[in-house]
Amino acid sequence: MGLDLPNDNLIRGPLPEAHLDRLVDAVNARVDRGEPKVMLLTGASRGIGHATAKLFSEAGWRIISCARQPFDGERCPWEAGNDDHFQVDLGDHRMLPRAITEVKKRLAGAPLHALVNNAGVSPKTPTGDRMTSLTTSTDTWMRVFHLNLVAPILLAQGLFDELRAASGSIVNVTSIAGSRVHPFAGSAYATSKAALASLTRELAHDYAPHGIRVNAIAPGEIRTDMLSPDAEARVVASIPLRRVGTPDEVAKVIFFLCSDAASYVTGAEVPINGGQHL
């Protein structure tokens, strides 16, 4: 389904403690019944998002996904995938309250064990070149920051109670471009990812007292639609492991950060780049 009606309602604050206690009781009851953990994944239709949904689904998680594209049942053969997917442009900040309402409706009182903010955009010039700070329009700056930074902020705020009830985990997908000038990623993309890394630390500090862990992963060159064969050939020499990564390798780190194995990890940004950052 699509969410095509704008909604400028404010994101409401945390629930009262009494309401939270009822949510926690509901969590315990669901655990006793053996119900699966639940993840919200943005940008789930391809690349890293697709690999992440596949891995979590194979591990028995329920995946609520959203993307600009409709669900592709042939490429995404996980259980209830179509039923738990909705279309939304998270780059339009007016859509965030409505998207949060949609997630809450699908949770139907269930807790949210993981929020993976994977959706992102890295615009190029008409000739495919990187957009610099001199050539990027105001509209492009705003569009990139709304999707790459504002959406993760508002989703974390709007789903705080559901995450708190599950002692959940947030994983933000940043980039190696957030820490250095990148040959392909544009200025707006790079600075939005640097800001997302900073946001990860802020959220980790603010959410830790409530039992919510917040981390980030910073992929380098990963074989996705964003990396052309020509670009791949050009960057391999700068990677100590002498190859690009795969979406599956990134998904495994996301899974670790959402698992009990990472129960004492928060505020970290994990580089996944074959040593390219060295």
Swiss-Prot record:
Gene3D superfamilies: NAD(P)-binding Rossmann-like Domain (3.40.50.720). The keyword Oxidoreductase applies. The active site is at Y189. Keywords: Nitrogen fixation, Oxidoreductase. NAD(+) binds at residues 40-64. GO terms for biological process: nitrogen fixation. InterPro entries: NAD(P)-bd_dom_sf, Sc_DH/Rdtase_CS, SDR_fam. GO terms for molecular function: oxidoreductase activity, acting on the CH-OH group of donors, NAD or NADP as acceptor. It holds the Pfam family adh_short_C2. Substrate binds at S175. PANTHER family: PROTEIN FIXR (PTHR42760:SF106), SHORT-CHAIN DEHYDROGENASES/REDUCTASES FAMILY MEMBER (PTHR42760). Belongs to the short-chain dehydrogenases/reductases (SDR) family. This is Protein FixR. It comes from Bradyrhizobium diazoefficiens (strain JCM 10833 / BCRC 13528 / IAM 13628 / NBRC 14792 / USDA 110).
